[in-house]
Swiss-Prot record:
Displays ATPase and GTPase activities. This is Nucleotide-binding protein BCAH187_A5316. GO terms for molecular function: ATP binding; GTP binding. The keyword GTP-binding applies. Keywords: ATP-binding, GTP-binding, Nucleotide-binding. The lineage of its organism: Bacteria, Bacillati, Bacillota, Bacilli, Bacillales. GTP binds at residues 65-68.
Amino acid sequence: MTENNDIKMVIITGMSGAGKTVALQSFEDLGYFCVDNLPPMLLPKFIELMADSKGKMNKVALGIDLRGREFFEHLWEALDDLSERTWIIPHILFLDAKDSTLVTRYKETRRSHPLAPTGLPLKGIEAERNLLTDMKARANIVLDTSDLKPKELREKIVHLFSTETEQAFRVNVMSFGFKYGIPIDADLVFDVRFLPNPYYIPHMKPLTGLDEEVSSYVLKFNETHKFLEKLTDLITFMLPHYKREGKSQLVIAIGCTGGQHRSVTLTEYLGKHLKPEYSVHVSHRDVEKRKGH
């Protein structure tokens, strides 16, 4: 087993209905490998997998749901074993909320409390709170989510567990060809098939928007300049609002017929325009599929 002082492990637990799902999604956005409902008895084996992953699992968030006293024995043993290792220090994040808030959340979702499947949720909440007393005492961080919206809980987790780099809002700008389908992960799609097409100029047909001759041709038209002005205006207006809403990344897709000339040119342009302010990744999905529209 290889030691790695850079390995981070966060164990997420707490009251049912306090926000564990939102918390796991937040860690996933921060690049953590996330596992929900991991039985505590499997924790030692999972730690071995982390150590042997050669850096592929150096940030892990585990959602552990403790529904019975027998689970505690396995968890305490695993945590005590971890305390003897120097290469990994687990952080326990305990999510809590007022009883009244938890009851309201269960009523809103029409779900039964796991410890009171056929009874009143308050009875299940009381039983769970008693079970989790020791776990809460051992937690590094306790978050009361009673007055937090999901977005606010995410912001707290990002603030507590991310580096400045990880907090960066990422913008992915990609070109594509409509003939190959719209990217399924696109948040915003722009169609530039109305622009003059270099495909019909024989010597440009085998080239792409990465070639200066093609990009110069596409960018020389007045309609291209007007479109780029409006597009950059719109995108720069929207990005801060998307970021404020808690999105960790935005995928902007620009398409032409074959994804080789016009869309590539405009994707490169938009990427360069946004890079001074944002973490931007530019890609061209279909540029190598076929040289020609």
